[in-house]
Amino acid sequence: MDLSNLGNDIERVVVSEEQIQTRLKELAKQVEKDYEGKDLVLVGVLKGAVMAMADFSRHLQRHIDMDWMAVSSYGAGTKSSGVVRILKDLDNDILGRNVLIIEDILDTGLTLSWLTENLLSRGAKSVAVLTVLRLLS
């Protein structure tokens, strides 16, 4: 990614693109090992996880189904409202399937906690989360 046009907007890069790609590759190997012989679907959380899901899936050595959800716990501002809403639901049934949620940034955890419970209530066999970054408060 070319950061030269951002001028003074960025003080420093905390994690480089190369570091992220290396870690996603390692995680893909681990996921393949953990879910070997098991039915797995990746669920990307829109819109932030689009690039993470694309990059992660490219590191996988087998075909894995993908689906998308858009959920929000934010109102008009940048502070969580505490209420999670589904803005775009899954296109496919997850009954009896292992689900790996792909998220770009873990903030408060409210949305992912709610989403995990929601997917389990729909009959997912298991739900795990892969997040690229976690914000520390």
Model-derived regions, located:
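PRPP-associated nucleotide enzymes
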Residues: 1-137
